[in-house]
Amino acid sequence: MQISSSSFITKFTNLHMVRSTSDHHQWRHNYNLKQLFIPNLSVSNSQHLPLNQSVAAIVFGGGSDSELYPLTKTRSKGAIPIAANYRLIDAVISNCINSGITKIYAITQFNSTSLNSHLSKAYSGFGLGKDRFVEVIAAYQSLEDQGWFQGTADAIRRCLWVFEEFPVTEFLVLPGHHLYKMDYKMLIEDHRRSRADITIVGLSSVTDHDFGFGFMEVDSTNAVTRFTIKGQQDLISVANRTATRSDGTSSCSVPSAGIYVIGREQMVKLLRECLIKSKDLASEIIPGAISEGMKVKAHMFDGYWEDVRSIGAYYRANMESIKSYRFYDRQCPLYTMPRCLPPSSMSVAVITNSIIGDGCILDKCVIRGSVVGMRTRIADEVIVEDSIIVGSDIYEMEEDVRRKGKEKKIEIRIGIGEKSRIRRAIVDKNARIGKNVMIINRDNVEEGNREAQGYVIREGIIIILRNAVIPNDSIL
């Protein structure tokens, strides 16, 4: 079993380590693979096949997004590390698997090398056959299409010949950079019960955000009568989403989560017949489907949901993973790539309200309210507060440091050096933080581009670049 939940994080709350219970470990090792991945998920309408035979998921790995730079400098949004041991796309793939949807296509294009590698290593073995899989579809050029994908709709249109391989009845379209837990079975059942052509997931309990996936006007029967995206209307506040239509019935404006269930026939008709020039699902296909008279419904979701589309959102999502996002749910485990890493080692570390990933080496340090990723090394007398340490790809030994020091004049080991202090910062992979370094945003800068010095500032958060070297005694 190559896909596993073996890389469970270690979570600390007020010095008391919360571990997976022994029965949970027993379950992880002994749980029958067929029970886990091929449950009997017949829906309320008995004419439909189980979801693992009737629904295919299409997951977008994420395009170029300047709001997440520099985290997307060398990786796509879906490949960004989250909560110490995982990648963002793992949350969406896990939702599919836990819901019994085991035909999963991941469309990738922008900076896709690390994402393609992660998906192929993490999920290549769970299928037990050609009809249960996570298949990566990388952007391609052909004699007919010599350009790259021009948008979400264009990507699906050009890959329809792949998606049509199996006789599924619905496609579940998912962004790969959202953090949430959802039972897609309920969504599919709602879609089928209402006999909708398209069902859009709406968010009923989120605070005001600048929603990139748009707003939908929903009537009393949950029918979507209008769909607008950012730029076509002003941001609607939570308090003013209800309105009265011209016929006297009430409607409300609901933010879209960018999650769609689309019937197979409707998908083909829209992309190949009605809207053959359209490139984007949210701004063109959904409004076009409403104009064509298709039945578009809303399915409301009131759980935790975060669109990780900015540095601030990424920071919030990690902090939320400490407080309330449950990784220890036996019914809805979070899967990722299995790794052969040892348990984290701690000498006299003081750790509170934090998550520590696998294989960390923590000396006499203090960690408060932080996420510490895999293979992180933190030296003596270091204080880390309200920060995200992404981790490292390798362990670097003293002899490696001495050798590299002679070759490249790099004398700082990967990790965080003695007596350094890090507060409200993001330290990307393989960064070298010297001794007595202060990463505290001393001047309270909101936005700053200092890549030559190895860091940038976004929304008041300092981001240390991947592979950056911060010299001893630096104050940022």
From Swiss-Prot:
Question: How is expression of this protein distributed across tissues?
Answer: Expressed at very low levels in leaves, inflorescences, fruits, and roots.
Principal location class: plastid
Q: Where in the cell is it found?
A: Plastid, Chloroplast
The record ties this protein, via PROSITE patterns, to: ADP_GLC_PYROPHOSPH_2
Tell me which GO cellular component terms the UniProt record holds: chloroplast
UniProt transit peptide range = 1-55
One of this protein's GO BP terms? glycogen biosynthetic process
Q: Which UniProt keywords apply?
A: ATP-binding, Chloroplast, Nucleotide-binding, Plastid, Transit peptide
Keyword Chloroplast recorded: yes
**What terms describe the molecular function in GO for this protein?**
ATP binding; glucose-1-phosphate adenylyltransferase activity
Subunit structure of this chain's protein: Heterotetramer.
Into which family does the record put it? Belongs to the bacterial/plant glucose-1-phosphate adenylyltransferase family.
In Swiss-Prot or TrEMBL terms, this protein is called: Inactive glucose-1-phosphate adenylyltransferase small subunit 2, chloroplastic
